[in-house]
């Protein structure tokens, strides 16, 4: 049975059991900072299990993409470990419980997958008599095929919170897969009894003291590994033989030219590359980019591990993007979004692999030096400081260092590495705090952590309010009052000031009372989701508890609102013009400009930029109303709202609809697109691998930019003595004229050099059986001096050329030696090193060619006069 068919049957089966079948969630968790990537079928559903959110149905079924890396070192070595897999699961949120979960699990296995009932075993938790009785009395599995196991095997819990016993369905693959022990049964470490389905009965809550209480809402969470089921149903020994993975393995075998099954180490490398290709494809496909931390580092680690094993197999060039092609061909039936993002995924992988190839050779060389020194010194452990140097200076992953060190029979001081890393992070943290000049979550600020600050600035730019706190952030003190000239942080409630977040910079303005006035220099959001005002008192004094009026700088905020709406419209236009793979990777919304970072693998062409500008300006001309919709997260997604994975969303969300551009956003926006007036992109740069940056202007700022460009064209036209509409034509004429003159200059230069070469050769000195050319010249730059020296040397069968020149009040030297004299011990680098000392300088180079400089050009002649002695000394000591 094909793997795609197994997946399809599973979802269809539970659809017949009134389950809401949902396509796989992204590998990137939404609003869950506790995990980097989704590693279990239930992980995206946690809010439904905890009751934080209401599920779309009390019954759900999914085939969830998962990534797990704790056992990454085992991937390729064992037949069952993988970083990427699909988890089939059916879930109940307070609906059905043990009986249905067990019956349906057995029904699907026997009737839909046609597994032999005689081969099925069940394991239950030691004390779970209810599950045992259902399996035996109602399903009909005999006592001898039901196993009671302890907490380690059959009780699911993670610290405190919901937990419960579980029951596993196992399949007996036969004695040939076993360990020959008479006690062999489910729970044994051998491969005979394959666990194919885990049914978790979440019925208890565990408190911090370890006490268990029964939950009011009992849930079901099941998981069946798709690839593991395929191994069973396709009757193959490992996941590398199933229909969706074997073609990838065959591709890697062909690419490497290695015969599978002849060398265990090479087989491991082949399997690592095969498995990691699947992981990389899906992780990049869901929007993760390689990085040095977070989920981006997980991706980088997997990709670089595969690349390194390619090198071990003798694959020299980048190779993974072709493997990505194959993974997509195989998996696009179930995941059509991979096809949509094919070129993007391939390019990101290619860029990262190429980057790794350039750095890994240098890192490997240094690591090998460390290992050689350890061997000479009789050491068994690589010091943490050395591993950190590889990581910090050369971008060499710790995991790769660990792997190579272990392969060579050594150990790694990981504690020392961690200490170095922590030291660096602490230094960076302190530097950041010093540069910011304040600690937002100070002890003084903590006094207000339970105080709610209401934001009213969507509708009001002026607000009657009250000061609830004054903080001297420099001394971490709470103040009762503040005087003219002092700078402090102030909390007011309610507040019309928007605190910097979501890329939108904070508001400025003023607050004033009967007793004083303060300029609001900036607004930020602290760790308690409160707007904090950085203010300077300009008149009188302000006291805690004062009634104040808050007034936002109107024009500045209006400009910010226009630019924020423009970022949404730009995001939409990028997806339309460049491709659906484009995702926002960062933004800055300021009053005078906007900046937008997005995922893409190449610079945008001029034509693409024009098309993007046309799309945005078209939306502006339509003058569509900007709609704000407050709704729940699920409905927002049904509206097609774009959610940024890095952002956290509550169940209640705010949707901004600007024509076809629909996004979740908490920022402030224009009321209609026509307010933007004009949109103009003025800069494009690269932020990093796979991330581009556009900077743009709107409204008055865009007009000023175009006016400036027009003035520049006018100035150029005046310089060229032509009309503005003929600037390009006239410039082209000048360029062609310059090219012609450059050719003429080059021709004259060659003629001069020919005469100069002949002149220098005529002044050469015969020493034994070779010629010495040592001369002082004037006003030759380094390039010309090298060129002339090369021409002279090429005229000599055997000889030494040393030329010196005075230029820009400095001395320059170039030395060249023919091959025969190099073999006799003449060394150009040592010659220029000595002559340069005479002029107060230094330098060096190769035996056949070297260059040096000095600060005292008046001693050039003295230096050149010493060349003959140096050459003779070198020959006499050879």
From Swiss-Prot:
One of its GO terms (molecular function) is transferase activity. The keyword Cytoplasm applies. One of its GO terms (biological process) is alanyl-tRNA aminoacylation. GO terms for cellular component: cytosol. Its cofactor is Zn(2+). The keyword Ubl conjugation does not apply. It is found in: Cytoplasm. This is Alanine--tRNA ligase. The gene is alaS.
């Amino acid at each position: 049975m094909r793997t795609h068919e197994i997946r399809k049957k599973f979802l269809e089966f539970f659809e017949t059991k009134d389950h809401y079948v949902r396509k796989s969630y992204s590998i990137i968790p939404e609003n869950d900072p506790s995990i980097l990537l989704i590693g279990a079928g239930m992980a995206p559903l946690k809010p439904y299990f905890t009751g934080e959110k209401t599920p779309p149905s009390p019954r759900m079924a999914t085939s969830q993409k998962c990534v797990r890396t704790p056992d990454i070192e085992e991937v390729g070595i064992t037949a069952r470990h993988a970083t990427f897999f699909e988890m089939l699961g059916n879930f109940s949120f307070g609906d059905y419980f043990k009986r249905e979960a067990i019956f349906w699990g057995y029904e699907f296995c026997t009737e839909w997958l046609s597994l032999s009932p005689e081969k099925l075993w069940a394991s239950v938790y030691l004390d779970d008599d209810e599950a045992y009785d259902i399996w035996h009395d109602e399903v009909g599995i005999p006592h001898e095929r039901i196993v009671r196991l302890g907490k380690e095997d059959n009780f699911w819990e993670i610290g405190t919170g919901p937990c419960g016993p579980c029951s596993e369905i196992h399949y007996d693959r036969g004695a040939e897969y076993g360990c020959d022990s008479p006690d062999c049964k489910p729970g044994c470490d051998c491969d005979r009894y394959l666990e194919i389905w885990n049914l978790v009965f979440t019925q208890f809550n565990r408190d911090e003291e370890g006490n268990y209480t029964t939950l009011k809402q009992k849930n079901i969470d099941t998981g069946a590994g798709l690839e593991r089921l395929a191994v069973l149903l396709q009757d193959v020994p490992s996941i590398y033989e199933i229909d969706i993975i074997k073609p990838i393995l065959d591709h890697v075998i062909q690419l490497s030219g290695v015969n599978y099954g002849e060398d265990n180490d090479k087989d491991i490398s082949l399997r690592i590359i095969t498995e990691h290709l699947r992981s990389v494809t899906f992780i990049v496909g869901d929007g993760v980019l390689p990085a040095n931390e977070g989920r981006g580092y997980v991706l980088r680690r997997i990709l670089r591990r595969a690349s390194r094993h390619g090198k071990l197999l003798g694959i020299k060039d980048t190779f993974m993007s072709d493997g990505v092609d194959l993974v997509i061909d195989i998996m696009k039936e179930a995941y059509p979004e991979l096809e949509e993002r094919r070129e993007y995924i391939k390019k990101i992988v290619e860029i990262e692999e190429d980057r790794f190839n350039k750095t890994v050779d240098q890192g490997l060389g240094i690591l090998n030096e460390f290992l050689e020194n350890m061997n000479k010194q009789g050491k068994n452990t690589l010091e943490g400081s050395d591993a950190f140097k590889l990581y910090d200076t050369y971008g060499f992953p710790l995991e790769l260092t660990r792997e190579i060190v272990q392969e060579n029979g050594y150990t790694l001081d990981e504690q020392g590495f961690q200490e170095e890393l922590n030291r660096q992070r602490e230094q960076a943290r302190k530097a950041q705090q010093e540069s910011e000049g304040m600690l937002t979550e100070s002890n003084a600020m903590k006094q207000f952590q339970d105080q709610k600050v209401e934001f009213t600035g969507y509708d009001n730019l002026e607000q009657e309010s009250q000061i609830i706190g004054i903080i001297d952030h420099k001394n971490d003190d709470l103040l009762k009052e503040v005087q003219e000239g002092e700078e402090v942080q102030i909390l007011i409630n309610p507040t019309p000031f928007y605190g910097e977040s979501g890329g939108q910079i904070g508001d400025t303005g003023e607050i004033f009372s009967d007793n004083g006035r303060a300029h609001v220099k900036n607004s930020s959001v602290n760790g308690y989701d409160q707007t904090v005002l950085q203010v300077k008192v300009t008149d009188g004094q302000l006291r805690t508890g004062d009634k104040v009026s808050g007034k936002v700088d109107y024009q500045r905020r209006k400009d910010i609102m226009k630019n924020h709406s423009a970022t949404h419209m730009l995001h939409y236009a990028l997806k339309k013009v460049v491709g659906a793979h484009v995702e926002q990777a960062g933004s800055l919304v300021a009053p005078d400009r906007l900046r937008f970072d997005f995922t893409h693998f190449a610079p945008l062409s001029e034509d693409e930029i024009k098309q993007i500008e046309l799309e945005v300006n078209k939306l502006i001309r339509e003058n569509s109303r900007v709609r704000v919709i407050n709704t729940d997260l699920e409905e927002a997604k049904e509206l097609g709202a774009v959610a940024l994975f890095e952002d956290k969303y509550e169940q209640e969300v705010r949707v901004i609809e600007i024509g076809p551009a629909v996004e979740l956003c908490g920022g402030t926006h224009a009321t209609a697109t026509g307010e933007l007036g004009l949109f103009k992109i003025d800069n494009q740069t690269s932020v990093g691998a796979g991330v581009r940056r556009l900077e743009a202007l709107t409204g008055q700022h865009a007009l000023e930019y175009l006016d400036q460009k027009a003035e520049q064209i006018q100035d150029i036209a005046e310089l060229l003595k032509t009309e503005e509409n003929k600037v390009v034509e006239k410039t082209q004429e000048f360029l062609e004229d310059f090219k012609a003159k450059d050719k003429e200059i080059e021709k004259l230069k060659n003629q001069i050099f020919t005469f100069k070469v002949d002149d220098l050769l005529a002044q050469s000195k015969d020493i034994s059986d070779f010629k010495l050319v040592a001369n002082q010249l004037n006003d030759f730059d380094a390039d010309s001096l090298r060129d002339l020296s090369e021409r002279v040397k090429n005229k000599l069968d055997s000889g030494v050329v040393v030329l010196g020149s005075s230029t820009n009040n400095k001395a320059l030297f170039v030395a060249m030696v023919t091959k025969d004299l190099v073999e006799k011990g003449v060394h150009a680098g040592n010659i220029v090193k000595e002559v340069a000392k005479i002029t107060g300088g230094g330098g060096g180079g190769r035996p056949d060619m070297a260059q040096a400089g000095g600060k005292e050009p008046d001693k050039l002649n003295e230096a050149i006069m010493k060349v003959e002695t140096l050459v003779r000394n070198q020959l006499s000591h050879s």
